[in-house]
Amino acid sequence: MATINNQATLTFSSGGSTVEVASNKASVTLQGPLTISKRSLETSYQLDNTIVYTVEVKNTSTASLQNVTVKDDLGTYNITATAKVTPLTYVGPAQRFENGTHVGAVTATVDSTKTFVTFSIGTVAAGSTEIILYKVKTNNYAKGATGSTIISTASVTADGVSTPVTFPYTLTDDNYADVVIEKSMTPDPIVDGGVLSYVFVLKNYGNAIASDVVLKDKLSPIPAVQHTYVDGTQRDEHDFSTTTGEYLFPGLTSTYDFAVPAATITQDATTGVVSIVPGTHIVRVDGII
């Protein structure tokens, strides 16, 4: 929005001399007929996750505005002086609300480079408020280190409003653990009376340590559990019921601090691609079948 600045001068005679004095500087903000704001339903973002944005457009004039168009740059930023990457992917659909009432879907167009999405609202009546609600998803250009941000800018234009009215919105990366578990058994086949190894691979794709981890399983048929290993180191601090086959690690009386380290998240300085190497622990439980 433009600012109008103004300063007055005053001349008068005093003691045979002409004196000129200046007033203070007065200023007002010149607001155009359109205003825009943007927010998200989420307070932070995670990698490979959905974000719901809302963009609010108001026609503050006394006349209808035609061909109102909203654009979102999807957080596009420079990775080098000449190269840009876009950390958000538009997934839609986009819904339109007029003065609080849902009026249906709104046409969304993603440009060929996928660096921005455009919404065609059309006519906005005088004094009317339009809200567009839509979904995006973080992709492999979204920075994942703790404290990273995505700054996406929404803008609006209309007939007679050639200079876009903009609103930048910042989301900060969440501090989180994201652990998955994979189980396997070896050998296969197993000979009756042989040692069966239950292998659990724990992978943390988040940027924070997963603490107070507890591994539970119900082993059937019930084996004679011999040992527990974490990354090859024997740690027989488990609980096991020979009646139910229920296995618990660490056990209830264990003081072992079982945690899965945070992922290593890096960004290629040339391509901008973000890579994730999960923090990993491998737990092996040996039992005689």
Task: State where each predicted segment sits.
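Exported/extracytosolic protein signature
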Residues: 1-289
